[in-house]
């Protein structure tokens, strides 16, 4: 594994190739980000999946109100660091529209709310209850709980950082089991992640991101692949995923995360 480079200080390096129009004013940055997400939604609607996938949830559509509140409140200016997840979990973003969106954190720490509609197709084993969902998402509770303890207030975290998922879709088997993008047949997987990779490049440039931290190895690898040719000046690093399925994360993810952020030189950006 390559030795991580400390997070650089100083002015942001401009991309070698123009991917989009110059960055808008802070007032319209959130609007521009939301427009990019809607553009991605349009592209994703054109995709078709095999019988392996029974139902597709897109919380950026049916949980638009809390998702829009998240972006407009916390993405008002350029971001140096983007923490990148892979795709929604059934009890996190699928319920709240917020990446790693553990209900209690979204409601009580991020201060977000709003109506969440029922998806066009809803699996009986995966009901969408929005902020009324009683089940906790362990990954989200660990992720946001760590930053709540570290930063104190969400405004401290979001001064320089933002959290986003590469793919907005939750894929469910006919049984209701969660299907990761990695489980899709190769052609479908590359079609899906190809459009998400292209969207990521546009989003990274829009926000002025200098460092992408992939939360989990898959997100890190996809970010490297997406940005390597179009935006090679953007640094990509990884952070252990806080999943309860990870024995290493279960031994103390918070300590691992803090050590990793210290290696990357990010702690000064995350403390007041």
From Swiss-Prot:
Pfam families: UDG. Substrate binds at residues 86, 100, 165, 241. Residues 175-189 are annotated as: DNA-binding. Keywords: DNA damage, DNA repair, DNA-binding, Hydrolase, Nucleus. Residues 1-27 are annotated as: Disordered. Disulfide bonds: none annotated. Gene3D superfamilies: Uracil-DNA glycosylase-like domain (3.40.470.10). The keyword Transmembrane does not apply. One of its GO terms (cellular component) is nucleolus. SUPFAM superfamilies: Uracil-DNA glycosylase-like. GO terms for molecular function: DNA binding; DNA N-glycosylase activity; oxidized pyrimidine nucleobase lesion DNA N-glycosylase activity; single-strand selective uracil DNA N-glycosylase activity; uracil DNA N-glycosylase activity. Signal peptide: none annotated. It is found in: Nucleus. GO terms for biological process: base-excision repair. Its EC number is 3.2.2.-. InterPro entries: SMUG1, Uracil-DNA_glycosylase-like, Uracil-DNA_glycosylase-like_sf. Belongs to the uracil-DNA glycosylase (UDG) superfamily. SMUG1 family. PANTHER family: SINGLE-STRAND SELECTIVE MONOFUNCTIONAL URACIL DNA GLYCOSYLASE. Recognizes base lesions in the genome and initiates base excision DNA repair. Acts as a monofunctional DNA glycosylase specific for uracil (U) residues in DNA with a preference for single-stranded DNA substrates. The activity is greater toward mismatches (U/G) compared to matches (U/A). Excises uracil (U), 5-formyluracil (fU) and uracil derivatives bearing an oxidized group at C5 [5-hydroxyuracil (hoU) and 5-hydroxymethyluracil (hmU)] in ssDNA and dsDNA, but not analogous cytosine derivatives (5-hydroxycytosine and 5-formylcytosine), nor other oxidized bases. This is Single-strand selective monofunctional uracil DNA glycosylase. The gene is SMUG1.
């Amino acid at each position: 594994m390559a030795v991580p480079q400390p997070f650089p200080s100083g002015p942001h390096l401009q991309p070698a190739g123009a991917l989009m129009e110059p960055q808008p004013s802070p007032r319209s940055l959130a609007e521009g980000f939301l427009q990019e997400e809607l553009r991605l939604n349009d592209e994703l609607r054109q995709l078709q999946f095999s019988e392996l996938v029974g139902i597709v949830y897109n919380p950026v559509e049916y949980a638009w109100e809390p998702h829009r509140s998240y972006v407009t409140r916390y993405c008002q200016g350029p971001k140096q660091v983007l923490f990148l997840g892979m795709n929604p979990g059934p009890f996190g973003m699928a319920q709240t529209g917020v990446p790693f969106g553990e209900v209690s954190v979204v409601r009580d720490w991020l201060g977000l709310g709003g109506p969440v509609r029922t998806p066009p197709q809803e699996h009986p084993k995966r009901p969408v209850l929005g902020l009324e969902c009683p089940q906790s998402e362990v990954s989200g509770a660990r992720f946001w709980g760590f930053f709540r303890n570290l930063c104190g207030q969400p405004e401290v975290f979001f001064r320089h950082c933002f959290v986003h998922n590469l793919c907005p879709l939750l894929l469910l088997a006919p049984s209701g089991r969660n299907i990761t993008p990695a489980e899709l047949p190769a052609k479908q997987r590359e079609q899906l992640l190809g459009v998400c990779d292209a969207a990521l490049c546009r989003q990274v440039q829009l926000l002025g991101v200098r460092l992408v931290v992939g939360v989990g190895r898959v997100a890190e690898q996809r970010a490297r692949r997406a940005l390597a040719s179009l935006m090679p000046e953007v640094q990509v690093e990884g952070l252990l995923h806080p999943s309860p399925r990870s024995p290493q994360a279960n031994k103390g993810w918070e300590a691992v995360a803090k050590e990793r952020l210290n290696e990357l030189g990010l702690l000064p950006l995350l403390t007041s």
